């Protein structure tokens, strides 16, 4: 079974406050006598389900076209942390990259999937992130708008992950996904030298 864990991208999809919202217009329409329908879109690449690039948090770091595809395909584990608030420590996860796959997907329950931008969401502690990266974490995905807190200006989790060659997915839709192991496929679009890239993220059930 393939499970779509991407947020539907449409006008009105909540954007990070201050970001350019997603918008679409029709450049040509068959109804107006044109031979084809052609649309044009505008918006921040952080609207909807996306992969952050290291360039997002530091000048000179790799852009969206340099994201390593292998980080976004492979074994992943969905962990439910919706009962938590504030900072989550490693012992509360019950997850080990060496035993459970190198990609961790957190269901916080604070998601834009319902049409509202959340005020807050739980995040991993810096010690937790350091420990996970040290044990081989390749990717952290969240259903929340960020792996850091809404108020953070220094974005320590972003910096620690990118410094450890681990990557980031944000705004996943994990509402109907049971916890446990999956195969993740979430390839970033090849936008050149941007701070993020949209993805169509899916999970494939693990057989046996």
Q: Predicted segment positions?
A:
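Active-/binding-site microenvironments in catalytic and ligand-binding cores
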Residues: 1-208
